[in-house]
Amino acid sequence: MSANYWASTQCNNWLLDRPQLELARKEDLRYATRLECAALGVFFSNLLSLICKRLNLRQRVTASANVFFRRFFAKNSYSALDPFLVCATCVYVAAKVEESPIHIKSAVAEATRSFTEHGFRGMPTDHSSLAEMEFYLLEEMEFDMVLFHSYRSLIVMFEDYGSGSAVGSGNSIHERSAGAAGSGSGSGGSGMMIGLGIEAAAFGVTKGLASVEEGDAASAIAEEDKVQLNEFNDEVLLMCWFILNDTYKTDIPLMYPPYMVALASIWLGLSLHPPSFDKITASLHTMQTRRDEHHLSIQRILDNPASTPAELASAKREPSPPSQDALTFFASLNVSLPLLAEIVQEMVSAYSVQHQVQRLVSDGPGIVKLLERMRESRRVALIKDRDQTRTHA
């Protein structure tokens, strides 16, 4: 185990690129379309969330189960194995890894119930099948079970740089959630924020206890350039949390470091939050106007034959950007901005794909028939290849 993300197996062994993930789907694409393969990933992500919710497991377990499932199928095809059995096994293993163990009978019973509701009745009722699959799952993941999730980095950055940070208000998300936990708050924005605070604490983010990876997330801004992100308020934090939830329906957690995914969620959250987006747009327009005026004043000096070097020197300095501004915040990041833009684009593209596969995902029996068709096509192809091999021999 490691509290250092940079020394972890997740960083060194399990950051996959797009060609590696495409290679994993190569066999499936012989028997299904690319959109159908994407629908399978979203469908089983939804199933994992449903089973974890019914078993009263924490969000951390749900996130880990999703990562385990996608890691497994980054090495295997949907058509060669039973994704339903793998799905149930991922929940069972993730609960143990995240120190929220459940009995194997509960895992099998709840998985069987959820699968039946979605049209699949082939889940083995004996516990030995799930126990056996557990060993296959661990072996395929090379026993690398320690995970770093983006939620922790998001909370650390909110407390350090958000409008609700200790710098800004003196109250952390943990203090606010703890103080209001027994207040019986009703519905609405504050109630949702309290719920998020409790969920964050339950997720494992404890005040004053941060891993090295979380420290790196907080120090992504150069020490001399640290600013407070006023637009990063409670509403934006909630939106970022939901965005991170949605990333687990994609391969993003397998492709990028957690703190970069958290930063990308902040950018997307600010863009989707109308007041924050309007403020960013206004700031961009103001700065562009000031720069244009500055360049115009320099041009006037250069065009004036009577101007002196002292006048030019006094006008050379560019106007400084506002310190408490989202654009200034992201410009001061000590990270790769092209990589950040790439992750944001992946998130946007993922929402487009999820919208396209919505009809397929909502049809549980249709997904079951799709898998049966893929397996049958694979079986026929294997028999055909075997017969051809014998003929040539």
UniProtKB/Swiss-Prot annotation:
A molecular function (GO) term: cyclin-dependent protein serine/threonine kinase regulator activity
Protein keywords: Activator, Cyclin, Nucleus, Repressor, Transcription, Transcription regulation
Domain of life: Eukaryota
Domain Cyclin N-terminal positions: 51-146
InterPro entries: Cyclin-like_dom, Cyclin-like_sf, Cyclin/Ssn8, Cyclin_N
GO biological process, one term: positive regulation of transcription by RNA polymerase II
GO cellular component: mediator complex; nucleus
Location within or outside the cell: Nucleus
CDD domains from the UniProt entry: CYCLIN_CCNC_rpt1, CYCLIN_CCNC_rpt2
Function, in words: Component of the SRB8-11 complex. The SRB8-11 complex is a regulatory module of the Mediator complex which is itself involved in regulation of basal and activated RNA polymerase II-dependent transcription. The SRB8-11 complex may be involved in the transcriptional repression of a subset of genes regulated by Mediator. It may inhibit the association of the Mediator complex with RNA polymerase II to form the holoenzyme complex. The SRB8-11 complex phosphorylates the C-terminal domain (CTD) of the largest subunit of RNA polymerase II.
Family: Belongs to the cyclin family. Cyclin C subfamily.
Complex and partners: Component of the SRB8-11 complex, a regulatory module of the Mediator complex.
Protein name as it appears in the record: RNA polymerase II holoenzyme cyclin-like subunit
Organism whose genome encodes this protein: Mycosarcoma maydis
